[in-house]
Amino acid sequence: MGTTELSIDVGMTDANRTGVYLAILQLVFTLGWTTYAIYLPELAAKVGIAPSAVIFILMLDQAIFTVTDTAMGIAADRIAPIVGRLGVFVGALTVISCAAFVALPFVAGTGPGAQHWFITLIVIWAITSSALRAPPLSLLGKYRAQPSIPFLSALAMLGYGLAGAVSPYLGVALRNRDARLPFVISSVVLLITALALSRVERYLARKPSQPAKPRGVTEPLGRKSAIFIAAMVILALGYQLHFSLNSAPFYLRFAKPADLEWLMPVFWIGFNIAMFPASVVVKHRGGLIVLGIAGLLGALAVLGAEFAGNLNTLIAAQFVAGMAWGCMLMSAISAALAIGHAGAEGKVLGLVFSALALATFARMAAVAGGLQKLPEYAPLLHWAPVACWSVAGAGLLVLASFRLPQSGRLPRV
């Protein structure tokens, strides 16, 4: 084996370690959010908050994420030129976030008099936890070679997909258990994982796989970026409506409620499997093209789920829909890093996560308004995912076809 081949192998190993770390971080963070969502109704009741108001607390969380995800991404871009500073920034905010998170069940246990403190802790937790979304992923664009980014994005999103797959089982496992121990365990694991980011950042800075990028010369995000983010809002809304509102009723046409914990993860199995082969296509053709094709494929899969005549057909359609969403999210991360390649990686990634949060807020608003229970809105909710994924997918394909030719020094979007 020659020196060049050995260097490539070592570089790929280092890159894979970074991707695995980010996957673990996303897994632990998402499972912590799931734990919070499972216990929130119980904790809210202890401080005198009515069950009907819990959805509004969750909407508040998403509204905060919509703002702070972008803000944290911008902050990451400004901090990143000083090696090690980003890890310290994320670590410090994670300490605050975990402290607020651990305190929630203990404060709730003191009764209705602690209601204001309970809400305050939730707000603090939501604001500070945004530091764990876009900023760590921005390291991929700052230190990793462009051809490796799609695969590393797939690795990072694997943590998110695994968390989605195990969430139904986590809900069953935590049923009727005291909230304090799960909150403490998830916070400790998340804190340990997040504090390792500084070490990862310094290691990447010592062994960069691409030349240092000029900082402070970031071009303003133009029309293409705005269209990309708008498309992400639409795609994310399609996912929210399909998976969170429509998937369970689809399954209940052929299965019993007790079977849902085994059927719902089918979507996430497809999600996790499809990202890696799709990352090869993104490497050669760019994220926007894969994002658009995945949107159209997902729309066809939702149509298949809508018209499925038996459980096996529905399972296959849900599997394909999960594949499509996995390809969308992986290629969106890759495209965001390419768009922000000259020092705005965190900002564009933050906008992507803000788009996801905004779509989640919209879905929760629909639930809070009871739209899924109104017969006149049922067709809208059923067909909205098809419309969202097909329209956004087609628009992204058009955008990709009209992109300007790239020079050899610029990443493929």
Please tell me what each predicted stretch does.
Residues 86, 172-189, 368-392:
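A membrane-interface helix-boundary motif in multi-pass transporters
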Residues 68-83, 274-287:
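Helix-to-loop junctions at the C-terminal end of transmembrane segments
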